[in-house]
Regions:
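Phosphate/ribose-phosphate-bearing ligand recognition and processing surfaces
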Residues: 57-61
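Beta-strand elements within well-structured catalytic alpha/beta cores of enzymes
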Residues: 14, 48-56
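Flexible, D/E/H-enriched segments
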Residues: 1-35, 40-43, 63-138
Length: 138
């Protein structure tokens, strides 16, 4: 509200079961979901400006800078193969939310990467915390 005031922004939340087996989607299915979201947006009448937001962390509850780095590099380079071939066993617990980023990659594959950053945010000496990714495609 601080930025938008009372402006109402139409929003369609799409929830992906990243966390609970046995029906977590495959990484390829997440990418395809993103492509279908893009197709639906492109089919809208008019010239509405649409934002796609992936929520969720990269790695957490234990920070995994390696898998976060693979993800961020693949997002920057539009490397679908790298995004969809990550080992599923690495995408457990909170790290499973990388699936949301993969869906976003499918929706934005036609856009140019402008900026991204990664901050590994540790909260304990045991390595717990969250890998925080940020990016802009337009």
């Amino acid at each position: 509200r601080r930025i938008m005031g009372d402006t109402i922004v139409p929003t369609i939340p799409i929830m992906v079961n990243t966390y609970y087996p046995p029906n977590q989607p495959t990484l390829n299915r997440c990418y395809e979901l993103g492509r279908q979201i893009r197709a639906a947006v492109e089919a809208l009448p008019g010239d509405a400006r649409v934002g796609v937001i992936a929520s969720g962390g990269l790695s957490h509850f234990v920070v995994d800078e390696e898998i976060d780095g693979i993800t961020m590099k693949a997002l920057r380079e539009k490397d679908r193969e790298a995004l969809t071939s990550m080992p599923r066993e690495r995408l457990n617990s909170g790290t499973s939310e990388i699936r949301n980023w993969i869906a976003m990659a499918g929706a934005t594959e036609h856009l140019d990467h402008e900026w991204s950053d990664y901050v590994p945010s540790y909260r304990s000496k045991a390595g717990t915390g969250c890998g925080m990714g940020f990016g802009i495609w337009s």
